[in-house]
């Protein structure tokens, strides 16, 4: 169930422009605030605030990858609930991602409902 007044902002990081726009739109239409970034470095340059409630994070990014970004945030004391999205095969990422305790791992192409359900769980 979507909150009428979401508790904060969803941070989205994906290097695919069209996917980033589509996912941002889906999140906004569901009633959530969202900030979207094309790279981990762009998110880190802005910084994470108390207003940010979860990450939707591509695993395979140029430069700093999604798993490295999650570890960097953990090391700085920012343990945001994370939903990983990826085009990689499950066998390539299941073990390493499990260690980061994500709310969900969604394999591209994923269903909008699965994404929004995961965001709801992250914000609960």
Regions found by a protein language model. Give the residues of each.
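Non-catalytic signal-transmission and effector/linker regions of two-component phosphorelay proteins
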Residues: 1-11, 17-21, 35, 44-45, ...
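A Lys-centered signature of the CheY-like receiver
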Residues: 108
């Amino acid at each position: 169930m979507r909150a009428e007044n979401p508790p904060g902002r969803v941070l989205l990081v994906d290097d695919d422009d069209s996917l980033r726009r589509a996912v941002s739109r889906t999140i906004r239409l569901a009633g959530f605030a969202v900030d979207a970034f094309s790279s981990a470095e762009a998110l880190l340059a802005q910084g994470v605030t108390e207003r940010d409630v979860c990450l939707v994070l591509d695993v395979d990014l140029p430069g700093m990858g999604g798993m490295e970004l999650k570890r960097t945030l953990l090391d700085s004391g920012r343990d945001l609930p994370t939903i990983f999205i990826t085009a990689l095969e499950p066998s390539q990422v299941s073990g390493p991602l499990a260690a980061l305790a994500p709310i969900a791992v969604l394999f591209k192409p994923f269903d909008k409902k699965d994404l929004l359900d995961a965001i709801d769980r992250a914000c609960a």
